[in-house]
């Protein structure tokens, strides 16, 4: 290639480019035979993005070339013309993008789905710089290395308004992330309206104020789906359960600490012999399962303690029952932080293990389970990076480096 390879981010599987620059018409005609409302909205969005950098008013003097070839046609072909209501773990994002100046300047996109077509349009948008492309002959072939390309947003500790979440989703789409891990409950709050237990959010005041209505969640999921992004909810139990304290009481959720209450700070759920805690959590998670269409539900299960009546065995039983309920009663795949497998041993064979602290992905995939890598030393962007700018190399750690090829297939491809 004649110029820097960083034309598209993240860098695709294959990129070939050569030839002189190619100007792009301020009026792009994007056509497709795939009758998808989602793809139509993607075309509308990316047309607006490209127009912002193509419009003559936004170009520096001398960038336009009278009589030079102009790219004015973009043709999209979707090989599997089935419109999924929402993206899932089975969704395909592969695409091929070609740009040719001859015989007539045009871009051609072949994608496996409307999600792949949107990724190609994102790549095409990134190629347009000040009204032109860096080369007139470009071929991009791309598919994700990882099925789960996620970002976690902690709304259990801090509330983020819906418009802020939408801005985040736009940014995620720009770098081809496809999972918003919505950490919806923690010490401070349960951040989603429950119609079965309305006091969960009606009691949120002061610094703990702020929650999403169920209509907000539906709108968030729809906005994310349009950008090929799944919304995977996490309801962190039995530890990190201070946000569930409004459900405490003789007939509700029981807690390990004596005197647990709104001012206790940290709450851990007790798996009481009468099953009151489990019954309340099952009812709440069932409601949330109906609200979130994704096929994965994250149960947290991290950082529990042996405290008061809460023993390691009682914690194991509680986590195992909830993981089983997610799979059997709700028809979803359970997920938990690494403690669900390495500490409590409560992970079922189908449980996705989210490694983050003391363990690595190969320890999970060696057991035949799927792993999501979220190692705090590499990926916690709210923490200061050691060594200043030089410390960012940890962010580029290859999370699959020590995973045997035979274990990568079910876990990533």
Regions found by a protein language model. Give the residues of each.
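Extracytoplasmic/secreted cell-surface and envelope-processing proteins
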Residues: 189-192, 240-243, 307-309, 344-346, ...
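Active-site neighborhood of glycoside hydrolase catalytic domains
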Residues: 261, 265-352, 356-368
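Short alpha-helical segments and helix-capping/turn motifs at coil-helix boundaries
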Residues: 49, 53-61, 165-168, 217-218, ...
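Flexible, acidic glycine-rich loops studded with aromatic residues
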Residues: 339, 346-351, 357-413
């Amino acid at each position: 290639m004649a110029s820097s390879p960083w034309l598209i981010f993240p860098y695709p599987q294959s990129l070939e480019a050569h030839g002189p620059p190619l100007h792009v018409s301020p009026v792009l005609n994007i056509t497709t035979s795939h009758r998808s409302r989602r793809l139509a909205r993607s075309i509308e969005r990316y047309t607006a993005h490209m127009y912002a950098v193509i419009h003559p008013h936004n170009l520096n003097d001398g960038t336009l070339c009278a009589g030079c070839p102009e790219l004015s046609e973009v043709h999209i072909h979707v090989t599997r013309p089935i419109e999924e209501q929402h993206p899932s773990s089975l969704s395909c994002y592969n695409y091929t993008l070609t740009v040719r100046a001859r015989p007539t300047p045009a871009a051609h996109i072949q994608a496996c789905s409307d999600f792949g077509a949107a990724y190609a349009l994102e790549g095409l948008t990134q190629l347009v710089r000040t009204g032109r492309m860096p080369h007139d002959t470009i071929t991009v072939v791309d598919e994700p290395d990882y099925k789960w390309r996620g970002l976690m947003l902690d709304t259990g500790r801090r509330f983020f308004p819906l418009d802020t979440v939408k801005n985040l989703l736009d940014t995620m789409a720009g770098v081809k992330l496809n999972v918003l891990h919505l950490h919806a409950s923690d010490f401070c709050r349960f951040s989603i309206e429950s119609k079965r237990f309305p006091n969960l959010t009606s009691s949120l005041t002061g610094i703990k104020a702020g929650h999403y209505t169920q209509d907000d969640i539906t709108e968030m999921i729809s906005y994310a789906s349009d950008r090929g992004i799944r919304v995977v909810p996490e309801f962190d139990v039995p530890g990190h359960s201070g946000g569930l304290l409004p459900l405490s009481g003789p007939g509700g959720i029981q807690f390990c600490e004596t005197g647990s209450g709104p001012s206790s700070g940290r709450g851990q759920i007790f798996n009481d012999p009468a099953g009151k805690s489990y019954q309340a959590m099952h009812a709440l998670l069932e409601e949330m399962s109906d609200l979130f269409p994704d096929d994965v539900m994250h149960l947290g299960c991290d950082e529990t303690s042996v405290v008061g009546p809460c023993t390691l065995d009682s914690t194991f039983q509680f986590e195992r029952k909830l993981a089983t309920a997610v799979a059997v009663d709700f028809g979803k795949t359970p997920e938990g932080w690494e403690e669900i497998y390495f500490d409590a041993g409560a992970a079922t064979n189908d449980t996705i293990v989210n490694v983050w602290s003391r363990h690595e992905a190969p320890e999970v995939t060696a057991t035949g389970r799927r792993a999501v890598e979220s190692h705090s030393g590499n990926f916690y962007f709210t923490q200061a990076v050691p060594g200043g700018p030089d410390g960012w190399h940890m962010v580029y750690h290859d999370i699959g480096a020590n995973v045997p090829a035979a274990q990568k297939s079910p876990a990533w491809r």
